[in-house]
Amino acid sequence: LGLCLAAPRKSVRWCTISPAEAAKCAKFQRNMKKVRGPSVSCIRKTSSFECIQAIAANKADAVTLDGGLVYEAGLHPYKLRPVAAEVYQTRGKPQTRYYAVAVVKKGSGFQLNQLQGVKSCHTGLGRSAGWNIPIGTLRPYLNWTGPPEPLQKAVANFFSASCVPCADGKQYPNLCRLCAGTEADKCACSSQEPYFGYSGAFKCLENGAGDVAFVKDSTVFENLPDEADRDKYELLCPDNTRKPVDAFKECHLARVPSHAVVARSVDGREDLIWRLLHRAQEEFGRNKSSAFQLFKSTPENKDLLFKDSALGFVRIPSQIDSGLYLGANYLTATQNLRETAAEVAARRERVVWCAVGPEEERKCKQWSDVSNRKVACASASTTEECIALVLKGEADALNLDGGFIYVAGKCGLVPVLAENQKSQNSNAPDCVHRPPEGYLAVAVVRKSDADLTWNSLSGKKSCHTGVGRTAAWNIPMGLLFNQTGSCKFDKFFSQSCAPGADPQSSLCALCVGNNENENKCMPNSEERYYGYTGAFRCLAEKAGDVAFVKDVTVLQNTDGKNSEPWAKDLKQEDFELLCLDGTRKPVAEAESCHLARAPNHAVVSQSDRAQHLKKVLFLQQDQFGGNGPDCPGKFCLFKSETKNLLFNDNTECLAELQGKTTYEQYLGSEYVTSITNLRRCSSSPLLEACAFLRA
């Protein structure tokens, strides 16, 4: 008996919110038994919110929620996460999301930040694409102090006239002024109002009643099958530009995700839930069985357990939590409708920097203090976790190596400013307007290891700044991959320190962790052999035979330039560079002996935050940059005792990108191609997550 009680429950406890759902769930349970699939049991509650609480308390396992509730469920103390998304059919392509867009007629001449006083068309009050997203996005421009003042009143005063079906037309006649229904049907919450829903809101624009329609990406295509007709319309983008209607992936107010099944983020039984859903859709999905249909409800009750319009489910990669699933624009728009005007304005003005590891966090806090809180800090223990915080809108920016600019770019972030180093050219333009020259990736060895060349590295011990970074991973490993065709880098070198690799593997064997020998192989400065200085230290302390760093690393840490005990007696002449032709040269001759030229590190952010971020960073570097009045007195942005915290210590300034504003343009096609090839060797959980989110 004891054994039976200890056996894990093999049944998924599905949470229901009404008698009709409970009845469908019971049918679901019986039919899964018949096909001997994973078993499901039914838990009765009276609302989605009660279900969220029950799942968090381990009294139920799963429930399907819409985007707004996925947001609630992800918050503390529930911390649920989406594990499977419903898939819908849109224009022949199965989708797990749609995009909320603002459609206008070509030539109407205004941008998203100039909508005050125009006429607006909405799908309906309280709907995602037609109300919550656009009004949340326009919140900073509304004259609304926030709850408890009615939002409808502020919107009625913002647009010159609108059609917002379901609005309170008696109290706010302006919100129903453009609607076309007659008498009681004017502004009705159904298709009795001709301008209701997606197609209705578009018709309101098409007929010339309104100037802008807030709809979804497929609306224009469904209503105008002819491309020539579609060409008369454009989308308004968050960066206050316009784009063609088919560019909705680059130009939308928010991505609205489909309904998702949520579970606990710890011990959530998600494998079992997925087995149940996968089998259920195979047996009882669209056009499968007449006995029971998973995506069919009763005529009186729609969308029981799942949406009736769903085609099936896809599994959500485990890296994705509710914030990543919903995305920054959606989260910001939602937050904007819950906060006071002062809170919204403060959040927009502030720049939240993401610090990687405790040492960067300390420097960031100092920066925040001296900036009068114009800069605030978020922190994470790895660079990829920081990129995820920017994707969720919990941070605005961080400075990245080229390898991570690639990851961030694949996730939809853009480069904003690049680090620039002192130029050799004395009559070059000022730092901010000088094109960043990039830096040289080099392989450094001890002069005393005279027999070691680029061609005899196999079986040696290697030191790397971190996995996925440019100079120490993507460039040398890309070259080795091209030579050997093998991804087994742990077999090529006998031992390595490559922070960010599997701590149990030989790629972490040489790593040492912090002074307490903890956090070994962590990709942040807790690992003493992390970053350019750390990888060189790994060579200098004779742990490794070769260090992959950049051209200035040896120069910055020898001949007394670094006063730390391990570096103070090192001499530049005791180290040499390996050239790709099998020869060696002094470290000062990197120009003619390097592995590749690498793009400079650059600051990335969401595209709609880029202009504001630039403005703030230029002011900050004017004050705390190398030539600023407050460096070294109060704080130096580009100094950190040779640790390269937040920025590289040899940065002269953050510079304009010379028009290279996408990750592909900034990194250059050669580097992008080499990383794409190298990525076949390793999977990054964040890249997998972003591939799912941007599919």
Swiss-Prot record:
Q: What is this protein called?
A: Lactotransferrin
**Domain called Transferrin-like: residue spans:** 12-339, 351-680
This enzyme's EC code(s): 3.4.21.-
Gene coding for it:
LTF
What are the binding positions for hydrogencarbonate 2 in this chain?
T465, R469, A471, A472
The Swiss-Prot or TrEMBL record annotates one GO molecular function as:
serine-type peptidase activity
The chain's coiled-coil residues are none
Q: Which InterPro entries did the record assign?
A: Transferrin, Transferrin-like_dom, Transferrin_Fe_BS
Q: So where does Fe(3+) 2 get bound?
A: D401, Y439, Y532, H601
Self-association and partners: Monomer. Found in a complex with LTF, CLU, EPPIN and SEMG1. Found in a complex with MPO and LTF; interacts directly with CP, allows Fe(3+) incorporation into LTF and activation of CP ferroxidase activity.
Residues that bind hydrogencarbonate 1, according to the entry?
Answer: T123, R127, A129, G130
The active-site annotation reads K79, S265 (nucleophile)
Question: Which amino acid positions bind D-glucose, per UniProt?
Answer: P436, N600, Y666
Q: Which GO terms describe its cellular component?
A: early endosome; extracellular space; plasma membrane; recycling endosome; specific granule
Q: How is it modified after translation?
A: Poly-N-acetyllactosaminic carbohydrate moiety seems to be needed for TLR4 activation.
Query: Family assignment?
Result: Belongs to the transferrin family.
Q: What does this protein do?
A: Transferrins are iron binding transport proteins which can bind two Fe(3+) ions in association with the binding of an anion, usually bicarbonate. Lactoferricin binds to the bacterial surface and is crucial for the bactericidal functions. Has some antiviral activity against papillomavirus infection. N-terminal region shows strong antifungal activity against C.albicans. Contains two BBXB heparin-binding consensus sequences that appear to form the predominate functional GAG-binding site.
Q: Which residues cross the membrane?
A: none
Identify the residues that bind Fe(3+) 1: D66, Y98, Y198, H259
The record's principal subcellular location, in a coarse class, is secreted
Gene3D superfamilies, per this entry?
Periplasmic binding protein-like II
Instruction: Print the keywords alphabetically.
Output: Disulfide bond, Glycoprotein, Hydrolase, Immunity, Ion transport, Iron, Iron transport, Metal-binding, Osteogenesis, Protease, Repeat, Secreted, Serine protease, Signal, Transport
